[in-house]
From Swiss-Prot:
Protein name: Putative lipoprotein MAB_4074c
Lineage of the species this protein comes from: Bacteria, Bacillati, Actinomycetota, Actinomycetes, Mycobacteriales
Any single GO CC term annotated in Swiss-Prot or TrEMBL for this entry: plasma membrane
Record family assignment: Belongs to the mycobacterial 19 kDa antigen family.
Stored InterPro entries: LpqH
Localization of this protein: Cell membrane
Keyword entries, A-Z: Cell membrane, Lipoprotein, Membrane, Palmitate, Signal
Signal peptide annotation: 1-21
Lipid addition sites, S-diacylglycerol cysteine: 22
Record bears the keyword Signal: yes
Lipid attachment site numbers (N-palmitoyl cysteine): 22
Topology term for the membrane: Lipid-anchor
Organism superkingdom: Bacteria
Length: 154
């Protein structure tokens, strides 16, 4: 029963993070978009299989930086929302790794995972630990995996 509550809470956190991450009070302005940015995505020290790295797109708009990708044959996907400031902060991150839906999120009184962002010119390196549940076996409990995402934006 507890695992069902955890999985349900993870889903609500992820949905809430997307809504919060995609909304703000700042004027929209013109978006800065870059794609095919030689992205690197590693989870647990390995390349994230099934992710179309050429499709990784970075959009700077309205005070946020949104990083997203397409999947190959519907396997994996990646979504990151971070603040567009001198020291960016990840507000939400979601990815699927080996059948597990993993996230970094902070909201509604709960914190899931952790992430740090380093900036070198137009290159953003996001490192941390994402937590979640195996969607094939949600009763197995929470899992946490280290990740590194490197993407060029601008």
């Amino acid at each position: 029963m507890m695992n069902r509550v955890i999985v349900g809470a993870m889903g609500l956190l992820a949905a809430g993070a997307v809504v919060v991450g995609c909304s703000n009070d700042k004027p929209a302005g013109a978006a800065q978009v870059s794609s095919g940015s030689n992205a690197e995505v590693k989870v647990d020290g390995k390349d994230l299989a099934g992710l179309d790295l050429k499709s990784v797109t970075c959009v700077k708009q309205g005070g946020n930086i949104n990083v997203a990708s397409a999947a190959i044959n519907g396997q994996q996907g990646l979504g990151v929302v971070m603040t567009d400031e001198a020291t960016p902060k990840v507000t939400s991150l979601g990815l699927v790794y080996d059948g597990a839906a993993l996230a970094v999120s902070e909201g509604m009184g709960a914190k899931v995972g952790s992430a740090d962002v380093k900036v070198d010119g137009k290159t953003y390196t996001i490192t941390g630990e994402a937590s979640g549940a195996d969607v094939k076996n949600p009763m197995a409990g929470m899992i946490t995996k280290p990740f590194t995402i490197k993407v060029s934006c601008g």
